[in-house]
Amino acid sequence: MNAKLKMHNTYDDTLIERDIVLSDASTGAVIAAIENAFDSADCTDETVFEIEREDGIIFYCDQWSDYTTAWSLYRHCNGSIQEWVANFKM
């Protein structure tokens, strides 16, 4: 399944979008793809992050917790990186 990753910094209205393939990907592969997509992004505590699957389902997080990696984003949003990835891969 394909998905679009979106990162919107509401402070300066910067929007970054990346495409990602979710089907048949391990949890680690999905995490790595997300980290790579936003690695150079200027994330702040006013950043909105979401993944929109091709079937229209959106998974949303309203804050990037320490501005550096997707790992901290997952912990901030759901407490469990495995659960978060499993949810949007379904």
Label every PLM stretch briefly.
Residues 25-85:
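Acidic, low-complexity, intrinsically disordered interaction modules
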Residues 3-5, 20, 71:
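Intrinsic-disorder/low-complexity peptide segments enriched for small residues
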Residues 1-2, 87-90:
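Short intrinsically disordered terminal tails
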Residues 1-14:
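Short aromatic-glycine-(Arg/Gly/Cys) micro-motifs in beta-strand/loop hairpins
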Residues 14-25:
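A short, exposed loop/beta-hairpin motif centered on an aromatic-Gly-Thr core
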Residues 8-10, 21, 54-56:
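Short amphipathic alpha-helical "recognition" segments used for binding
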